[in-house]
Amino acid sequence: PHGTANALLAPYVCKFNAQRHPYHMGTFSQYKYPQAFERYVELGELIGVKGKNDEETFKNWIKALEQLKADIDIPPTICDWLCEAHPEKSAEDWEKEFLAAVDQMSEWAFHDACTGANPVYPMIGELKQVYLRAFYGDDKFIEKYGDVLCLEINNPTDTHAAYPLGLTAEIGEDKVGGFK
């Protein structure tokens, strides 16, 4: 479900967008300098989340997003959600499927029409990093990959590898990329 996917990704997208000195600003940004961090701090203050300084208020804003997810029974990570929604598969099985799909998912996200309006224009490897952080959670991601911002992308050789959750698409002469 779209809303659940947004909730699972939101804290990690906010952390990515909060960069004060990004390599690339959004293509269609409505401002001359990065403002996402300040806006997230303002949102935190509006809902009563404060800190000793802006950095602490931002961290507390992220904690508030995580608490909202918990309050509405959305697990903390994509892996946790998949394991709850589909208990017939193990976390290891889901990890294998997710890793097989994440490069293609990252490329699709990069080419999505909405990406240019994001406050920070991401590279494909940065999108992969956001997806993997959302899949594992920050601590497990850092344990596996280190605290990196951009990961290497491997171009998928199997079009079907891009269909997580066991979804598939038929490829035929009348279809392009599996879609009519």
Which residues fall in each region the model found?
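Gly/Pro-rich interdomain helix-loop hinge
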Residues: G3-E97, G116, K140, Y145-L149, ...
